[in-house]
């Protein structure tokens, strides 16, 4: 558990919830500042780096889930120039910028002075090339584990230990890559395990549940950073709106977290007693067990959102493949 519960940080994830509109993005940035979030986060993709040229020419033969995600990404496209404008707007109103780059080309934008931190999303948890390249930028690094099994987490621990030569501050997020997850998928107790696995790192919780109760309870189990999506309207079209928080909900999460941290700092309290104030039993609902499981929903989303190595073009037999060829 945390030694100081007053250090809880909050990340407002905009993601695709701007729907391709800079004006909506600015409203979300402003709201994030008004409710005292520490970071506002953007997702940046270069579809020419992520998708195979054949898919971009004609994706009608691909699986429906791939078609849906690709269409949503295209609808919510914002140019690099617009992102730079949004970075400057965030800096102007004094809220830190975090970026999730989905490819090496998008990572280049993270070199900007306006970008304070980088987050590696769950689909890229095992993308060691992206992680190592991000570490070289010497900025705080946040990594989500939503699609990872225990063995994957142990493997990435070795990668981080070997390659974090600049001693970049690292945060590991407990996460479930369902949008939204069922309560029995959330498994907040695994935050305890991550704190033991990574004693030198900060541990956080990246939530996609409806409402914010599990996010709030995550503090008890050792979360020092909480990330949630922010939306202007939960009924808006798009993949993340229905698992996002409104300004009012997010603000209440932050206010209530201060009450909980004050409670936990002043006295030790049993799990049963702590949960009883939320009318939850210790072994039910979102609490789970200290065992890492990847739900069927997360497995499905991993298949749709994660990457695989493919050739950029056809090569003659005997060609020695280099990184630039993939």
PLM feature spans:
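Catalytic cores and adjacent flexible loops of soluble metabolic enzymes
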Residues: 1-326
């Amino acid at each position: 558990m945390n030694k100081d519960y007053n250090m809880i940080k909050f990340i407002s994830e905009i993601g695709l919830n701007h729907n391709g509109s800079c004006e909506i993005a600015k409203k979300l940035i402003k709201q994030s500042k008004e409710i005292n979030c520490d970071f506002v986060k953007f997702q940046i993709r270069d579809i020419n780096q992520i998708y195979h040229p054949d898919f971009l020419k004609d994706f009608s033969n691909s699986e429906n889930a791939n078609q849906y995600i690709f269409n949503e990404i295209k609808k919510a496209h914002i140019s690099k120039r617009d992102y730079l404008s949004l970075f400057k707007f965030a800096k102007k109103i004094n809220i830190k910028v975090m970026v999730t780059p989905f490819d090496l080309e998008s990572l280049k934008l993270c070199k900007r002075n306006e970008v304070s931190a980088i987050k590696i999303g769950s689909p890229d948890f095992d993308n060691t090339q992206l992680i190592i390249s991000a570490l070289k930028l010497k900025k705080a690094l946040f990594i989500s584990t939503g699609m990872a099994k225990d063995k994957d987490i142990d493997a990435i621990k070795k990668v981080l230990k070997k390659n974090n030569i600049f001693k970049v501050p690292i945060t590991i997020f407990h996460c479930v890559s369902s949008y939204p997850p069922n309560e029995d998928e959330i498994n907040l107790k695994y935050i305890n395990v991550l704190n033991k696995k990574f004693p030198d790192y900060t541990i956080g919780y990246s939530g996609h549940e409806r409402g914010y109760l599990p996010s709030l309870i995550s503090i008890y189990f050792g979360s020092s950073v909480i990330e949630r999506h922010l939306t202007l309207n939960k009924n808006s079209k798009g993949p993340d709106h229905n698992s996002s928080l409104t300004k009012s909900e997010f603000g209440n999460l932050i206010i209530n977290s201060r009450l909980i941290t004050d409670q936990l700092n002043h006295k030790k309290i049993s799990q049963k007693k702590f949960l009883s104030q939320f009318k939850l039993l210790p072994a039910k609902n979102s609490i789970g067990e200290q065992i890492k499981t990847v739900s069927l929903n997360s497995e499905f989303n991993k298949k749709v959102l994660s990457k695989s190595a493919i050739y950029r073009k056809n090569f003659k037999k005997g060609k020695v493949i280099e990184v630039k060829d993939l």
